[in-house]
Amino acid sequence: MYIPTISPYAFKIGPIDVHWYGIFMAISIAIGGYYLYRQAMKLNYDEDFLLNLLMIVVISGVVGARLMFVLANYPEWFIKDPVQVLKIYEGGLSWHGAVLGGFLAGLYYCRKKGVRINPLEDFAVLGLSIGNILVRIGNIFNQEVLGRPTEFAFGRWPAQLVGVAMGIILLIRYFYIQKKHMPDGYQFWSFIFYYQLMRGLIEETVRDNPLIWPVYLNEKWGIGFFTLTQLVTPFILILAYWMIRRVLNDPNKQFYN
């Protein structure tokens, strides 16, 4: 949805403009991190280990989000204007890069400390779901992640609200799965599977992103295939499904050692 009168700035601190997007992201990180910490403490994880892990995952997630965004959209910056890559305050983050960066850093740290990551990655799902909700709301303030124009009465697909709905569905699903006591690791990989399925089939179809492989475009309906995210969706689904099967077939195994 596009609201031209809305401001992306919540307030100013001296010369610094504080974006609503940043506030929503910080809130989601705080909620997700606190929840993971509290749940992990119930399983007797070491407190210092958890605090260090959270710091490493958050920093690596932000770095991964920025690098993936630049790689997918402006790869020439790495050579022609590397300083631009560092200007994260100007916007431009990738959800997939954030998850990949945070996961790999968390995996490395857990392996270094000899700690099982499977339960921890499951606890991260709540924060990821809430993050999808709040960050998409932040996208509305930033006037980004817009939907494709359409000839339907609403004029443009509300892609950000589609993302909010996805986050709500995944959050409800998280609590439902928690009650079923599935094996460690199932929550995380099934979350990745269903997130990517909805992202590739629904959100990206109505989102105003470039079609890397323009197989189909209906300007009247405002839908199109295939964006970059849609092209990588089958590979992510295969990986997630493979990990789900491994978790279900051998619940007690730590698959990342």
UniProtKB/Swiss-Prot annotation:
Please name the top-level EC class of this enzyme: transferase
Q: Does the keyword Cell membrane apply?
A: yes
Listed EC numbers: 2.5.1.145
- Kindly give the membrane topology term recorded for this protein: Multi-pass membrane protein
Q: Which residues cross the membrane?
A: 13-33, 49-69, 88-108, 123-143, 152-172, 185-202, 223-243
Entry keyword set? Cell membrane, Membrane, Transferase, Transmembrane, Transmembrane helix
Q: Has the keyword Cell membrane been applied to this entry?
A: yes
* One GO BP: lipoprotein biosynthetic process
The principal localisation class reads membrane
Q: Where in the cell is it found?
A: Cell membrane
In alphabetical order, the GO MF annotations are: phosphatidylglycerol-prolipoprotein diacylglyceryl transferase activity
Q: In which pathway does it act?
A: Protein modification; lipoprotein biosynthesis (diacylglyceryl transfer)
Q: Which family does it belong to?
A: Belongs to the Lgt family.
How is this protein named in the record? Phosphatidylglycerol--prolipoprotein diacylglyceryl transferase
- Organism of origin: Thermoanaerobacter pseudethanolicus (strain ATCC 33223 / 39E)
Provide the gene name from the record: lgt
